[in-house]
Design a protein with these regions (language model features):
Chain A
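ABC ATPase nucleotide-binding domain helices that frame the ATP-binding cleft
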Residues: 43-46, 142
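The feature captures the beta-strand-to-loop junction immediately N-terminal to the Walker
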Residues: 35-37
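Helix-to-loop junction immediately C-terminal to a conserved catalytic motif
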Residues: 50
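Non-catalytic connector elements of ABC transporters
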Residues: 237-239, 248-362
Length: 362, 312
């Protein structure tokens, strides 16, 4: 079975711990994205799976076998590198054929396989060229072709689309997804681009400082972020995280002070478990309704900056106490700079994070 | 247009002329000519009749260029000097004798290429090691290796002579080749290490993941990428070794004498003063092998020297 499993994997470089106690399992046919800001340990995790870095602690299990002490060439994996890492002195065709030499595949079979993947990835016309003679998109596809030309245990992608322009990125995203769907292999994709992760992954593992903060489906990590970091990392524009002072909770409504304003907003019932004190309220910019009259369930703020984004408009508003709030409204809603807004958060989309930043949810 | 005619003649084929303009191109040509002048003078001297070598004013050209050059600057070219390199009479009335220069040319070519190639093989492997598997104190070792080139030859020659005499390497091919190899190694390791340092480590990682062992990564992936570096290192090493005089003078025997040593002896023997045309003929012949190697490797050489200075 083509699976990947990390069991309490830790990787240290000297005194620096790049990956801390990571547990992750990827089923056959599943695509898992490691997502996080730069330096969060996602690429190190990938290199540990590939065997390019040894683990300090824990176990790397690929296809049911512990691979800790096996060098990369014995792990039977395929990897696509951020900078493609095509062999500069070999033609594109030879590049794609390279992994097949080690599998002892005969010349005719080799040519057939190269031609097959070249056809899938539209590379037939560049097979005889050198890597520095083809376009960025073709390089990406050649690197991809080299990975899928044989039948490895699993696929690893390191920021596969980061070097492409926006348009090409969109089409490649689709292509990669399509190719991967037909292969039923465990796949790990490292990216710092949440859109890439949300669109390509079956599950997303969000990393920060070497730790996995949350693993879940794209829908889960967006709708039910496990903590304030995940909440702020996923979604554009960023979720509003407002410091609040929780007073009481009764009948599904929490009384609290947010930026100097006393509010009574409906929240998750689990908030009842919290002691009164400091919490963080998370509301996505699209989860506000602007109402004409303010009441105890609305936050009043003044529009400071307006950014039209096409179908929607992003408003940067500021409360009297100086808290910044991002609000997205539809294009038809005309708001002028300086206008007073009464913002009512959608109770189903209002997240409460406790003092440690952990989501409070039933 | 003048340019199109010149273009057809092969001028300006490089876009350099268009960019730099004719003025600058000509200025560079003049400087280049000044640099080449001594070499050209030696080559011409090799073709002059013996008496012409020291004429004042000198003869300058083998042809009058359709009357452009006055007759007293024109010499009558001859191949006689080249013949005398290999065979000439050693006494005023004696019959021509073989000079042994064929042997010396063979020695020069054999010793220089053997030692440079040997240094290239050992040095490239060592450089790869230094670059990819750094030891604790890597830079110190590299520095120590370079110190062998910091002393002038004259400083180390006496202990080397003594050591060679004790182990019986004096005058043997093995001895001189070993010595040159050792001297070329420092240079080779430093050169090749910088080439390996420039390579993208991702490419090697990719090859490992694709199933290559360390050896295969080196031979199939790394080595093809540093061909320019190998060529550059080879040529520079060859030029240094080819022209080396002092070690060759003191450590080669009659059978292993190299051309620079033999040249020295040809000049100072015979008691007739220096035979300048003969010397020029030897020098001209001596130029040819290194000139050819450099010429055939020059594309690699240029890429080798400018390696890493262009955006990857």
């Amino acid at each position: 079975m083509s699976t990947i499993e990390l069991r309490k994997v830790t990787k240290r470089f000297g005194s620096f711990t790049a990956v801390k106690n990571v547990d992750l399992s990827v089923a056959a046919g599943e695509v898992v994205c490691l997502l996080g800001p730069s330096g969060c340990g996602k690429t190190t995790t990938l290199r540990v799976i590939a065997g390019l870095e040894s683990v300090t602690d824990g176990e790397v299990v690929i296809a049911g076998k512990v691979m800790n002490n096996l060098p990369p060439e014995k792990r039977d994996i395929a990897m696509v590198f951020q900078f493609y890492a095509l062999y500069p002195s070999a033609s594109v065709g030879e590049n794609i054929a390279f992994p097949l030499y080690h599998d002892g595949i005969s010349g005719a079979e080799r040519t057939a396989r190269v031609n097959r993947v070249a056809a899938i990835l539209h590379l037939e016309h560049v097979l005889d060229r050198l890597p520095n003679q083809i376009s960025e998109g073709e390089k990406q596809r050649a690197a991809m072709a080299r990975a899928i030309v044989r039948d490895p245990n699993c696929f690893l992608f390191d920021e596969p689309l980061s070097r492409l322009d926006v348009e090409l990125r969109q089409s490649m995203r689709g292509q990669i997804k399509e190719v991967l769907q037909g292969l039923s292999k465990a796949t790990v994709i490292v990216t710092h681009d949440q859109l890439e992760a949300l669109t390509m992954a079956d599950r997303i593992a969000i990393m920060k400082d070497g730790l996995i903060e949350q693993v879940g489906s794209p829908h889960e990590v967006f709708a039910k972020p496990a903590n304030a970091f995940v909440a702020s990392f996923i979604g554009t524009p960023q979720m509003n995280l407002l410091e609040a002072d929780l007073k009481t909770f009764a009948d599904g409504t929490a009384e609290m002070t947010v930026a100097g304003i006393n509010l009574a907003i409906r929240t998750d019932a689990a908030v009842a478990r919290l002691q009164p004190g400091k919490v963080t309220i998370g509301v996505r910019p699209r989860a506000f309704t602007a109402t004409d009259t303010g009441d105890r369930g609305t936050i009043s703020a003044r529009a400071e900056l307006i950014e039209p984004m096409g179908a929607e408009t992003l408003i940067h508003a500021r409360t009297a106490a100086g808290a910044d709030i991002r609000v997205v409204v539809t294009r038809s809603q005309r708001v002028k700079v300086g206008e007073a807004l009464n913002l009512r958060p959608d109770p189903r989309q209002t997240h409460v994070f406790d003092g440690a930043g952990k989501a409070v949810r039933s | 247009m003048a340019e199109s005619i010149l273009g057809k003649l092969g001028f300006g084929r490089a876009s350099g002329v268009d960019k730099a303009g004719w003025g600058r191109t000509l200025a560079v040509a003049v400087v280049a000519f000044i640099y080449f002048l001594p070499v050209l003078f030696i080559i011409f001297t090799a073709f002059k009749p013996q008496g012409d070598a020291l004429l004042v004013p000198p003869t300058l050209s083998p042809t009058s260029l359709f009357g452009l050059i006055p007759d007293h600057f024109v010499f009558k070219p001859t191949l006689e000097n080249f013949g005398s390199v290999f065979s000439r009479s050693m006494t005023p009335d004696g019959a021509p004798e073989a000079t042994g220069f064929d042997r010396y040319f063979f020695n020069s070519i054999f010793i220089a290429s053997a030692s440079v190639l040997l240094a290239l093989v050992i040095g490239t492997l060592a450089a790869f090691g230094f670059s990819r598997y750094p030891l604790k104190g890597n830079d110190t070792y590299l520095f120590i290796i370079l110190t062998t080139r910091m002393l002038p030859a004259i400083v180390v020659i006496i202990p080397v002579i003594l050591m060679f005499r004790v182990v019986g390497l004096s005058g043997s091919y093995l001895g001189i080749i070993m010595l040159y190899t050792a001297f070329n190694l420092a240079f080779t390791i430093w050169m090749m290490k910088s080439f390996f340092d420039e390579l993208s480590p991702d490419v090697e990682d990719a090859a490992r993941i694709d199933g290559s062992s360390g050896m295969r990564v080196f031979f199939k992936i790394c080595l093809p990428q540093v061909i320019a570096g190998l060529a550059a290192t080879f040529v520079f090493g060859l030029i240094l070794t080819w022209n080396e005089f002092l070690f060759a003078l003191l450590l080669s025997g009659p059978d292993t004498r190299t051309v620079p040593v033999a040249m020295n002896q040809a000049v100072s023997s015979g008691g007739r003063g220096t035979d300048w045309t003969l010397l020029a003929a030897i020098e001209t012949l001596f130029l040819i092998p290194v000139f050819l190697v450099t010429f055939f490797l020059q594309n690699h050489l240029l890429r080798g020297v400018t390696f890493g200075t262009v955006k990857r």
